[in-house]
Structure formats: structure tokens, C-alpha cells
Amino acid sequence: EIKVWDAENQTSDGFAGWHNPANAYEELQQAITELKEFGVEISKDNPIVMDLPYYSGADVYTNRAQTLKQSVEEALQGCVVVNLVSCADAKEWYYAGYYTESGKDANYTLYDVSGWGPDYGDPATYLDTMLGDGAGYMAKCLGLF
């Protein structure tokens, strides 16, 4: 059992609260079942393939991309494949999604460059990320505008 907080000892296990491979695989199986009803077949032989552009000019970004790929593919047991798309310089990486005019111009399935995000207690800092017409800090990177 994972304890988020141990009040008696004033400590936590320091676990990644969003990382739950068993739950991820269970959710994927549910999606596979539902998609099969629409004629969509997902399996190890016919996996979901997601493109992730990453900046290969720095080891930290390369390592992060490889770790994400390994984590997703192991947890989802080969039914999802992460295709790492190497961007030799930061400009190429930014133009894959961050510098696009709209979400429809983006060239990725997964992307980790979103610009500024919420980082303080004012509610506007969270709401401003999703402003309409592409004005939100993150709306464009999510492909919403």
C-alpha cells in the first residue's frame, strides 16, 4: 500500500502520484474494447503510434524522451508505441508545435513545449492558459485552436 502522507512520522513515500502502470493498462483495455465496437483494432501487431518531437541537441531532453517512451511502452505492453522524432536544434523542436499559428499546423501527437503555464495562486494564471481563439498560453499546443 502506498501512503501519500504519514501523519505520525510527517513523511511521504515520495511516489509519482500519476504513474500507475496497472491502471494505465486497465484503462487502455477498456478503450480497446470500446474502439473494437467501431471496427478499430488495437493490439501489439497493430499498435497506436504517437509521435514525440524532442530536442536531441541536449542529453537531458533525449534522456527524458527515451524515459517517456520506455515508460509508456512498458506500461501499455506494446499496444502503444512512442515514435521519437529527433529535432537537431531547438528551433526545429519549437516549430513542430510551439511556434505554429494554430493547432492544426502542429506536427506531433505528444508534445512537451507549451510555453508559460500556471505557476502561482491567482486563478487567472490557470484560466489564461485556455483562452479562446488561440490566445491561451496552452490552448494552441493542445491543438484546440
What are these language model-derived features?
Residues S43-N46, E101-A106, G121:
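Extracellular/periplasmic catalytic domains that process cell-envelope and extracellular macromolecules
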Residues E1-E26, V81-Y94, A106, P118-F145:
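Extracytoplasmic/peripheral linker and loop segments enriched in polar/acidic and small residues
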Residues E1-E74:
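Append "and occasionally in soluble cytosolic enzymes with long acidic Gly/Pro-rich linkers
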Residues Q66-A75, A90-T109:
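Short helices/loops that flank or line small-molecule/ion binding pockets
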Residues Y111-D112, M130:
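Short, well-ordered beta-strand core segments
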Residues N46-V49, L76-V81, D105-L110:
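Loop/turn elements at helix/coil->beta-strand transitions in domains of secreted/extracellular proteins
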Residues P53-G57, V85-C87, V113-G117:
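Active-site-proximal beta-strand/loop segments in catalytic clefts of secreted hydrolases
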Residues V72-C79, G115, G134:
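A generic secondary-structure signal for well-formed alpha-helical elements
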